[in-house]
């Protein structure tokens, strides 16, 4: 949340608050009404003038960039868009590890690192000095070679187009952004324009000062609508008050149909073995067929299940029973994950996977501070002069919230159930490899061409919901 700095003057002065709310659902590319940019997806850099108050250029090439600089850029992909996708993946694994360290090993985790990056990229539009530098470093935007902080927004627009504007509509991947600002404030015109053109985030005025509770209800209703009712009351009572000036909301909703569905007739209750040694019954789905698979270091199994259309997949990472999932989480890096994915090959498998749903919500503040995003949350140090007109420098982020939802079931393609994998009854074929997710595992949902991690999480206890 954005708030005025301590040196801003009188007690009770207005504060500017940012809430970053992240969900799973259906998404569309930024559509800008009443803007000279007719189609952001075919626009050139000169068509989208991004003129923030401050610009940051990385002092030198990062070692992490050098590590992957020789990798082949996907076909018909701008190199900088590809590097942005890689930067988002670096942030994803780094943030996930910080979050996992703060959680109990028996807790489920689910988040959209892409949604978090998007929300803070919009915040970066108004940042200066060390606040801008820390945003560039923590979110790994500084690993994009030879480009400045203002150009990141153009690449985000192109990345969003690649992710959300698909010819294949068999899977719903939808993102929505909105700025809710207090009607008594005048917001920087450039900040509003770029937020709308690049991120599709229109500014909606609300009366936080006189009607904070009604404003909270309005925002929660907007979030519920954009997530098909999956996320409700995301902003708790009291989070918005008469001092609030701005609430930034980002939502992502995903619903995918399996390319090869699990037959409900093959689902049966089986035990799931939790970290604490206890077990609980879960509906365990089952199918046999060819999937991309690999047994990697120390017996960890990696399985990729495609959604219809093949452009988005779910990746499951299952340690062997003798190795804890926490150990795999600690060792995971973007480079190691990419190595595992590159090694996947078509394998005849017997797949056992629990049917489950999970919802996770938490504050982002503590983890981001631990990662080095210090000034943004400090009333004394934050520099966000590019958000409110007049360049006022008394704004800071008091908190940011994330919420995500995932449901996995047997559903496959609605009209094309006859896919390349034939579903059979349960068997004991000794010649087929078994992938049985009856113990804690990692789950990722990614876009294949750019290897963009859209969602990431841990299923440690599928019995809770």
Curated annotation (Swiss-Prot):
Any one GO cellular component localisation term in the record: collagen-containing extracellular matrix
Reactive bond (site feature) positions: 426-427
Gene3D superfamilies: Alpha-1-antitrypsin, domain 1, Antithrombin, subunit I, domain 2
PTM annotation (Phosphoserine): residues: 69
Entry comment on modification after translation: Phosphorylated by FAM20C in the extracellular medium.
Residues with Phosphothreonine modification: 64
GO terms for MF: heparin binding; identical protein binding; protease binding; serine-type endopeptidase inhibitor activity
Record Pfam families: Serpin
Keyword vocabulary terms for this entry: Blood coagulation, Disulfide bond, Glycoprotein, Hemostasis, Heparin-binding, Phosphoprotein, Protease inhibitor, Secreted, Serine protease inhibitor, Signal
Sites where the protein binds heparin: 82, 162, 178
Location relative to the cell: Secreted, Extracellular space
Biological process, per Gene Ontology: blood coagulation; regulation of blood coagulation
Subunit structure: Forms protease inhibiting heterodimer with TMPRSS7.
Function, in words: Most important serine protease inhibitor in plasma that regulates the blood coagulation cascade. AT-III inhibits thrombin, matriptase-3/TMPRSS7, as well as factors IXa, Xa and XIa. Its inhibitory activity is greatly enhanced in the presence of heparin.
PANTHER family: ANTITHROMBIN-III, SERINE PROTEASE INHIBITOR, SERPIN
Name of this chain's protein: Antithrombin-III
Phylogenetic placement of the source organism: Eukaryota, Metazoa, Chordata, Craniata, Vertebrata
